[in-house]
UniProtKB/Swiss-Prot annotation:
Name of the molecule in the record: Flagellar P-ring protein
An individual GO BP term: bacterial-type flagellum-dependent cell motility
Molecular function per GO: structural molecule activity
CC annotations in GO: bacterial-type flagellum basal body, distal rod, P ring; outer membrane-bounded periplasmic space
Function (record text): Assembles around the rod to form the L-ring and probably protects the motor/basal body from shearing forces during rotation.
Main subcellular localisation: periplasm
Family statement: Belongs to the FlgI family.
Compartments where located: Periplasm; Bacterial flagellum basal body
NCBIfam families: PRK05303.1
Amino acid sequence: MTLIRLLACLLFLPCLAQAGAVRLKDLVEFDGVRGNDLVGYGLVVGLNGTGDGLRNAPFTEEIMSNILERLGVNVTGEDFRPKNVAAVFVTAALPPFARVGSQIDITVSAIGDSKSLLGGTLIMTPLNAADGQIYAVAQGTVLAGGASAEGQAASVVQGVPTSGVIPAGARVEREIEFDLGSLTQLRLALREPDFTTAGRIETAVNSAFNGRVAVMRDSGTVELDIAATQARSPAHVIGRIENILVEPERKARVVVDQRSGTIVMGADVRISRVAVSQGSLTLRVEEAPIAVQPNPFADGDTVVVPRTNAEIEQEPGIKLAEVPESASLSDVVAGLNALGVSPRDMIDILKTIKAAGALHAEFVVR
């Protein structure tokens, strides 16, 4: 039984050693293997009275006239203002090595004052890249991300009904010319540049090929010599190295989102010894004017007399909290929670701690 337990521990040791490892293809971008952004504008039709008000969005009428004329319908001088049409921008990402005839997902977003794209159909829309060439053509039924309804005195909106997607809604009509097989050097661009991580990638790749085929050029680039790998093609090299496991060096970073009050801190965040006190002062001023009328049968005018109510509120009982030297993430969280403050107040506290030089991490505000 003891021997079986020992063998089981030996089997699990490699798994524990690789616990923090990440696949190489999740850490780097392969030079030349990249997608391209596409954009176009067109019309969504078939809306149930939730389209653009053509008086407020005249470009919708212009787009509609151009499309109808291309279809052989002469609308010159005609005055038509349907409410079931909306002008939209169409965006898509053309993946690397996409071939003619393959389909890609697209996103549709209203340009004008359309209330909802729910149930509409995008009619044939060319999608251009930055070079002005058409690489795909989009068409299909829009899947909106919300719903809206309105009456004479009230309206309700859930989600974002003016934006939606069309899965496989565009067909590729032109390929991006890139000859991967002609590469003699393959560069790996780190998504999070770091000298330690780049050095580990160099070591891991050289170990996989039992030779010196990779060289770290800087914190964001590792270069491979294709000939030294003795592989049949650069594609075979990528296929061989993309699943190599590497443990990245994580930076100490605090990211806060002021709009949502979200705070995310890495495990390596450290804080020097600091004392924190937080309180809030609320000043409320309310104007409530009153009308003073003259007595009956008396000469006089009605006078509006201003009346102001002012009050100040201060939260009592908020104490001073001390965070010890070289505190870890759990110490930081415990110290902030000891103040009993909201996430938005915590953001202000972290900003102040960073300004005081006690927060030893990159501070990112979004």
